[in-house]
């Protein structure tokens, strides 16, 4: 009996020791990741992207092409750019610990003028330049200093902003231009065009190649829908709740006739399956969208912010996915995250593919 008690005590001590080691490692890993985020933020370079006016493209290609044709072509070019960026993925221990290297595509409005930037790690400058030039041969890329959107005379309380995250699981797609024929990038441009002297606005679209496991999860989701399992069309957390599991264990087995009653997914699930399968055909990126607005008054800042939020609402799909806006309650943290381009390693459930990103930027 004593030997058994010693064994139990030993197992308890061993489990406690393992728990302490795990806790220490978790905190140490968090410290390493936060330090790496600052290091990455300090080693990023601004690339100013000069794009020719769309009217010039229309005139040069003749009157037979309308704006929609040109938009389709631009979106196709953007998909090429993101496909090249997807090749920057790397593997190994550092990738698992620190996550993939990220970059930021940004639309900045300052004193009524609008600028496009790619803010990238030093190690990725050449490949990002190549990606942009391949997609947009007429674009001119210039390394510059960062644009400060904050006015010295601006009131601290007039700074506002936050982040956009997906409303549902990442397997479900947002509304793209091909489906809605609504040019969201132009809507965002119009929202920023309303800025004037004294206003500063920035939209950051931070991306990094997503782990391939998101595709496996999406495939399991569609499989569950086809088999009519619980949770199939309601999310990626496939399985049973504790109460449902007990019910399954105690419930007598069904006859073959009862099992054959399931006639396959309904129309809603079939649409969801098709949408998910279409999304995973393209490279996926973990994505974080951050917006910061600075103006002379809080009312003015909120007005600009609401116009931007309204533009993102154009990406919301009734049946599938969309964006929800999360207002930042700590302005100091928001401004620091904006300046340093923080992209926490823990953010893994906001995944957009190259088609969805092309609709956005």
Task: Identify what each model region corresponds to.
Residues 2-361:
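Extended, folded cores of ATP/NTP-driven motor/assembly subunits in large transport
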């Amino acid at each position: 009996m004593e030997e058994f008690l010693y064994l139990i005590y030993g197992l308890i001590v061993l489990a406690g020791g393992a728990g302490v080691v795990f806790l220490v490692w978790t905190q140490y890993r968090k410290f390493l990741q936060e330090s790496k985020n600052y290091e990455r933020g300090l080693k990023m370079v601004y690339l100013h992207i000069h794009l020719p006016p769309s009217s010039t493209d229309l005139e040069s290609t003749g009157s037979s092409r309308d704006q929609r044709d040109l938009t389709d072509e631009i979106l196709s070019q953007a998909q090429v750019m993101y496909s090249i960026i997807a090749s920057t993925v790397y593997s190994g221990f550092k990738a698992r610990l620190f996550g993939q290297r990220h970059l930021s595509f940004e639309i900045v409005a300052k004193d009524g003028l609008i600028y496009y930037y790619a803010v990238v790690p030093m190690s990725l400058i050449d490949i990002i330049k190549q990606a942009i030039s391949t997609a947009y041969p007429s674009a001119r890329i210039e390394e510059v200093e960062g644009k400060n959107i904050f006015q010295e005379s601006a009131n601290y309380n007039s700074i506002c902003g936050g982040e956009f995250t997906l409303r549902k699981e990442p397997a479900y797609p947002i509304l793209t231009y091909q489906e809605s024929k609504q040019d969201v990038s132009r809507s965002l441009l119009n929202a920023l065009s309303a800025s004037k002297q004294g206003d500063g606005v920035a939209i950051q679209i931070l991306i990094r190649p997503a782990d391939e496991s998101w595709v496996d999860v999406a495939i399991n989701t569609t499989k569950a829908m086809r088999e009519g399992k619980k949770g199939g069309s309601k999310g990626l957390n496939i399985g049973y709740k504790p109460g449902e599991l007990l019910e399954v264990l105690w419930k007598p087995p069904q006859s073959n006739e009862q099992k054959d009653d399931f006639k396959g997914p309904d129309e809603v699930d079939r649409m969801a399956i098709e949408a998910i399968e279409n999304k995973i055909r393209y490279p996926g990126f973990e994505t974080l969208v951050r917006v910061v607005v600075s103006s002379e008054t809080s009312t003015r800042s909120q007005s600009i912010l609401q116009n931007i939020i309204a533009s993102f609402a154009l990406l919301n799909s009734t049946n599938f996915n969309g964006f929800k806006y999360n207002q930042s309650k700590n302005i100091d943290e928001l401004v620091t995250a904006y300046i340093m381009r923080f992209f926490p390693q823990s953010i893994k459930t906001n995944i957009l593919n190259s088609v969805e990103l092309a609709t956005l930027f």
